[in-house]
């Protein structure tokens, strides 16, 4: 895209903003937080934000997007303070909510957290006998590698094998940006 507005400065937002900037797009990164990558190491995040700015990215800290709409062949993003920014495209990277409503999970005995995530123990069991859950819907480290491990643990546990509980202290993650 010619001019990309990325709403959200977490890992996904930072990765896409950096990638599209490297491909030649003019990028505006809208962050509701004080800095990019708010959940990551502050020193590393500061370096990344500095590089983004030096490369020409418009990083808008403490700016919350209120709405986005198509206007002709453009996109308008209205911020909560009334400012409006425009671009050719907009990418929303503001997180996800689990799709667990109206599925009858609670009626089946599956306990949900207030956030809508499915409660599981360390071997992926839910509160309903014989029902397991794995992946982002559990609200545990939204990483593909963690989801795959949760799934393997659930399968082996269900089959009666001895399993080691998921140990989140040993999970590593990457942020795919340059730098």
Locate each region found by the language model.
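Rossmann-like dinucleotide-binding cores of NAD(P)H-dependent redox enzymes
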Residues: 2-5, 11-76, 80-81, 141-148, ...
């Amino acid at each position: 895209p010619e001019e990309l507005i990325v709403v959200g400065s977490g890992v996904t937002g930072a990765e896409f903003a950096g990638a599209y900037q490297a491909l030649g797009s003019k990028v505006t990164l809208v962050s509701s937080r004080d800095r990019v990558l708010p959940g990551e190491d502050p020193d590393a995040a500061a370096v990344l934000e500095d590089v983004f700015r030096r490369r020409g990215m418009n990083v808008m800290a403490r700016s919350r997007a209120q709405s986005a709409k198509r206007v002709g062949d453009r996109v308008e993003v209205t911020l909560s303070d009334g400012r409006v920014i425009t671009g050719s495209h907009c990418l929303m990277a503001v997180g996800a909510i689990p799709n667990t409503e109206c599925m009858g999970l609670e009626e089946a005995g599956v306990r949900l957290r207030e956030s809508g995530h499915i409660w599981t123990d360390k071997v992926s069991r839910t509160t309903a006998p014989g029902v397991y859950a794995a992946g982002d819907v559990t609200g545990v480290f939204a990483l593909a590698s963690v989801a795959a491990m949760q799934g393997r643990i659930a399968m082996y546990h269900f089959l009666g094998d001895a399993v080691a509980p998921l140990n989140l202290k040993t999970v590593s993650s990457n942020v795919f940006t340059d730098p």
